[in-house]
Structures are given as C-alpha cells and as structure tokens.
Amino acid sequence: MDAVSLAPKWARRLADSFLRGRGWAPSFDRTKVSEIWVDVGAHLGQGTLDAALSNSHLLVFAFEPNWILASKLMARAANFVVLPMAVSDTDGYAEFFVNSRDDASSLATMDETGRRHWKDVNLDVKSSTVVQTVRLDTFMGQCQLPRVDYLKIDAEGVDLKVVQSAGEKLRSIGKIQLEVDVSPDRLYHGAPSREEVIDYMSGNGFKLIATESQNNGRQENLTFLQPQAGGVHP
C-alpha cells in the first residue's frame, strides 16, 4: 500500500486543490506586501510570527506538517499563512515521524549511531503519519511568487533537500538560514555534512554570512546571502 492511499480523503482533497490551484496567496493584496518570507519547519513560529505581527507589509508562509503545532499558529495574523504540509524534493505524500521532542520530528529516519551523541535528550519516535509534500519551485509557481526574500529552514536532516527543491527558482531567493548536523555521526539518515551544504550553496551563488551553534555544539544554523537576488533581507 502506497503513501497516497494511506492519506485521509480530506488530505488528498487539500493536496489536489493546492497543486491545481493558486494556493492561498490570492487572498492577499499584493500591492501592500514588500517582503516575502518562507518558514519551513515553522514549529511555533520562532522568529517569523513576531516579525509578521510587527510588520503588516511582510507576508510569511509557514510550513508545519505537525497538525498539533500548526493549529497553534493558525489565525494568529492575517499575513502569517500556515500550511500544514512538508516541503521536500517531491510533490506528493511522505511518511512523517513524530518525535517525543516535537522539534525533532522529520521526514527522515534517525540513525542509531548518531543518536548516541544525544543521550541527554529523549528522541523516541511516538508515531508516524502521512503528510502532503510540496517542492519549493512548485509552491512558488502556484502562488506566483516572484521572489522569496528570506527562506528559514529547520527540517531536521532534510534542510538541503528543501533548498534543492527550489530548482531554478533558487536564484529568486535572497537569504537562506538552514540547520546542519556537525556531530561526528549525523542524527538523521541521509543528512549532508556541513561541508556539503556550504559547497552546494556557494556553487549556487550564496555566501555564508553567519554561523550559530545549536544544541550544545551538535548542530549549527548557517545563514547565506545571494546578493544578485535583490529584494529585502532581514
């Protein structure tokens, strides 16, 4: 049985409507929007919800496939659009692993060798569910987004796949923050190394401008800027 057949009918209807239509963006007056952000793995909207609340000219699209978390973000601000789905390198459906630590939930499975570096944290998988996935280039095309000024990614092991899913539209993204695992053994199967991420980003015209240590030095947030993309950068 494939992932699509496991998804509830309402989820399939939502997916079909989104992929055939123009998403939720047409409900906004584009003439009043001066900045567009995309938050992938929004969790509780750290850093992006407050920005939307304080700037009516900012439009944020927040992707959060965990419905419990997504429901806490919905209807918080008219310019903060919550999309209860995941961003990946394919359009369709995928298995999503819900972790005891909700910000560790992921489309990727955990590597038991990598988990040994996280003995101080409960990282047991509570359940799994089927979620809708969409590529960034599909999303940007359907919503007719000319650019994304800021792309914030916290997708637990699949951050680089999110970037790669932008395809040719990557050149229309001005600033990207993503997370990398810098432990000797990475936590998620298939997660790229710090060097692989930097090589890919620099090869696509991005410059590393900031590094922030996370989780007792086991992860880092890397921020990249693409000067030729133009737009407004936070």
Residue ranges of model-derived segments:
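Phosphate/nucleotide-binding beta-alpha loop and adjacent structural elements of enzyme active sites
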Residues: 1-234
